[in-house]
Regions:
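Short hydrophobic clusters on alpha-helical segments that form packing/core surfaces
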Residues: 5, 9-13, 59, 86, ...
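Helix-turn-helix
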Residues: 4, 8, 12-46, 50
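Hydrophobic/aromatic-rich alpha-helical bundle segments in the mid-to-C-terminal region
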Residues: 98, 102, 110, 114, ...
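C-terminal alpha-helix
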Residues: 127, 177-185
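Alpha-helical DNA-contacting segments of helix-turn-helix folds
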Residues: 48-55, 116
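Short linear capping/connector segments at secondary-structure termini
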Residues: 65-69, 100-107
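Amphipathic alpha-helical packing segments from all-alpha helical-bundle domains
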Residues: 60-61, 77-84, 88-89, 108-133, ...
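Hydrophobic alpha-helical connector segments
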Residues: 50, 64-92, 147, 172
């Protein structure tokens, strides 16, 4: 029943947005009574928390897996593949990303997004520390922070804005140039 409610909550959030998200709508979408919903979740905030937690967890898993699979690689191909994995993870549910990034009050997803950034940043810092000879940046943790936030923000804006002048391949090329230029400067 919990899975059904969470799936319905995700659907309601995407279809109606944050402002119209309610336990009654979620219960209707789940095909249960509001009373049944309250047996599992005390309020709409609890449902939102699970939906948002799972969303960022899904994104984190995809990106961490892509980075882990390429940990032995170095150079433009690795950057491109990892950025491509991030784009794919964000595109997997573009509409939920839109609601999470643009409609939810910042406090609702800040901690979860920060956890994703921290996880990827730690992997990137470890990766850069193991390849100090391949970069001119003195501190792997600082370099990882800059690279992860730059790539993440570019990816999110591209997925949400879908700029006609910037194709996916063009964006990936620019990300590779940005990261490569920064790490080698």
């Amino acid at each position: 029943m919990v899975e059904r409610i969470v799936a319905a909550g995700r659907g309601v959030l995407v279809e109606h947005g944050y402002d119209a998200f309610s336990t009654n709508r979620v219960a209707t979408a789940a095909g249960i009574s509001p009373g049944s919903l309250y047996q599992y979740f005390p309020d709409k905030a609890a449902i939102l928390d699970v939906v948002i937690d799972r969303y960022w967890e899904e994104v984190a898993e995809r990106v961490a897996a892509a980075l882990s699979e390429r940990i032995a690689d170095f150079g433009p191909g690795m950057v491109r593949d990892t950025a491509d994995a991030l784009l794919s993870a964000l595109e997997a549910d573009r509409e939920l990303l839109r609601v999470v990034a643009e409609e939810l009050p910042i406090h609702r997803s800040r901690e979860r997004r920060a956890a994703l950034e921290r996880r990827v940043r730690e992997l990137a810092a470890t990766y850069l520390a193991a390849r100090r000879e391949s970069t001119r940046r003195p501190d792997p943790a600082t370099a990882a922070w800059v690279v992860v936030l730059a790539v993440e923000n570019l990816a999110m804006r591209w997925v949400l804005d879908q700029p006609a002048a910037v194709t996916r391949d063009a964006l990936l090329d620019e990300m590779v140039a940005l990261v490569g230029g920064y790490l080698l400067a």
